[in-house]
Amino acid sequence: MTTDTSGRTGNPAAAAPAERFRYGFLKGNPQLTKNGELKHLLTIEGLPRAILNQILDTAEQFVSVTDREVKKVPLLRGKSVFNLFFENSTRTRTTFEIAAKRLSADVINLNINASSTSKGESLLDTINNLSAMHADLFVVRHASSGAPYLIAEHCAPHVHVINAGDGRHAHPTQGLLDMYTIRHYKRDFTKLRVAIVGDILHSRVARSDIHALTTLGVPEVRAIGPRTLLPGGLEQMGVRVFHNLDEGLRDVDVIIMLRLQNERMSGALLPSAQEYFKSWGLTPERLALAAPDAIVMHPGPMNRGVEIDSQVADGPQSVILNQVTFGIAVRMAVMGIVAGTSD
């Protein structure tokens, strides 16, 4: 991420295939208070296992709220949650809004195209003005890696920041809802083989998932994809790298498929979508190479016929829609935990 002194953020630089897996934003851990409590959620990287389990356990308690006649709890009553989405979103923005409302918060969705940012107002000036309106929590999605860190560093002390996806860097709540989904179906992380397939180079979800999986003790994490779409540094994380889909899928318990992020690519990294599907698309035949009870996941949006066949996406081993459902409870848990923390 590039910033000028006013806090304007620029687009991330185009990635090279050998881009390192880790980003260098963390100085200490700005997400935690001096007492080790979660004040902001900016990335899964660097968070202890205890905090990840705290979030997953809290989400477990909120899942039942969905089944109630009155789908509300008063945990954030009187709090103001601002959704600041500088990038398009369907699932993430909607589930954050639902989650905040189920916690009884007041929710403000900032229309970026109609806001003063479209008139040249800097990111920090926007944040300072919203803080002056006594915001309690910012949910931020931004095209620039590191933008939520900038906001957390400069916002008022009482304000909490949740990263809803920043560039290629991180998507921590997606990573957490993926972990919740895996735990729901598989229970024990320490006996699993998990495969992440596709455009890992440009995927903030893949980065968050890998940090979460390794922190939670998954013994074998596999990254599967063409050489042009895998970042450097995966092996140093303990990840097994495969450049052949059939080999990488053998006997895995969990398959996480990723879409091609064409909007973040520069240059011709791949052949056509049809050719990609032939080599890297998850078909029923390829799914049969995995464990018989393997589950199939996808963070969305899906591109059917590119990275996944419709028979798999809609089949009995797919838990893709369950991920969306669980995402509400996980985001309720994250907001409830960070908003209840003070320095």
From Swiss-Prot:
Record PANTHER family: ASPARTATE CARBAMOYLTRANSFERASE, ORNITHINE CARBAMOYLTRANSFERASE, MITOCHONDRIAL
Gene that produces this protein: pyrB
GO terms under biological process: 'de novo' pyrimidine nucleobase biosynthetic process; 'de novo' UMP biosynthetic process; amino acid metabolic process
Family matches, as Pfam families: OTCace, OTCace_N
Family (UniProt): Belongs to the aspartate/ornithine carbamoyltransferase superfamily. ATCase family.
EC code(s) of this entry: 2.1.3.2
Assembly with partners or alone: Heterododecamer (2C3:3R2) of six catalytic PyrB chains organized as two trimers (C3), and six regulatory PyrI chains organized as three dimers (R2).
Residues where L-aspartate binds: K119, R204, R259
GO molecular function: amino acid binding; aspartate carbamoyltransferase activity
Listed Gene3D superfamilies: Aspartate/ornithine carbamoyltransferase
Name by which UniProt lists this protein: Aspartate carbamoyltransferase catalytic subunit
Function in brief: Catalyzes the condensation of carbamoyl phosphate and aspartate to form carbamoyl aspartate and inorganic phosphate, the committed step in the de novo pyrimidine nucleotide biosynthesis pathway.
Gene Ontology cellular component list: cytosol
Keyword Transferase tagged: yes
UniProt keywords, alphabetically: Pyrimidine biosynthesis, Transferase
Organism: Burkholderia mallei (strain ATCC 23344)
Chain positions recorded as carbamoyl phosphate binding sites: R91, T92, R141, H171, Q174, G300, P301
UniProt pathway annotation: Pyrimidine metabolism; UMP biosynthesis via de novo pathway; (S)-dihydroorotate from bicarbonate: step 2/3
Catalytic reactions of this protein: carbamoyl phosphate + L-aspartate = N-carbamoyl-L-aspartate + phosphate + H(+)
